[in-house]
């Protein structure tokens, strides 16, 4: 039986919110908050993969297992691929990528992503989404949108408003029932993770800055379904960070 592991990619030099992995949330750095949240799961291991000696030292201070990776990776998935290779995980094992900026991620969503990959044998990656309920979120590039087919395989991910509802402008009320926000959690089989790192970064991946597009561009399937539980988007801005801080300080 395949083992299931959680790997948290943690890059220090984030673009939109520098050093966010170490941002204080109610007395603890964000990376610790994320780690403590995922320890509520029952998977085989939890690893932090980072390019930063500073993050490594802090993570080891709260007894996390850490793998130090190169600092030139194109994406978190590339970083995880290096980590699982170093750790010697079996090809049939499953790895769940939990973003290092989601300290409130529901455990139910992590479990659902892993189970979806087990259930969808044609997919090499699985992920989650949720219905958009605020029209403003459709036009926010920090909220990645996704469209998928009738069999729940992703067709495309974009920072733009997809699907495009012809005949409406951004200022008009549109039917938001067909808009879904992608939740940045992924489950992969280790064999595909190793292959992913060998694939060339695709033009659409560069254009959208979305690592999952490398999978679709190369003809592989991503299984997707709605999340088990609603969650906040990842912390990308100072405003996002303040929202999370308020929730921890309640």
From Swiss-Prot:
Pathway: Nucleotide-sugar biosynthesis; CMP-3-deoxy-D-manno-octulosonate biosynthesis; CMP-3-deoxy-D-manno-octulosonate from 3-deoxy-D-manno-octulosonate and CTP: step 1/1; Bacterial outer membrane biogenesis; lipopolysaccharide biosynthesis
Pfam family, one: CTP_transf_3
Keyword Manganese found: no
GO biological process: CMP-keto-3-deoxy-D-manno-octulosonic acid biosynthetic process; lipopolysaccharide biosynthetic process
GO function terms (MF aspect): 3-deoxy-manno-octulosonate cytidylyltransferase activity
Top-level taxon: Bacteria
Subcellular localization, as worded in the UniProt entry: Cytoplasm
Family statement drawn from the similarity comment of this UniProt entry: Belongs to the KdsB family.
NCBIfam families linked to this entry: kdsB, PRK05450.1-3, PRK05450.1-5, PRK13368.1
Record HAMAP family: KdsB (MF_00057)
Protein name: 3-deoxy-manno-octulosonate cytidylyltransferase
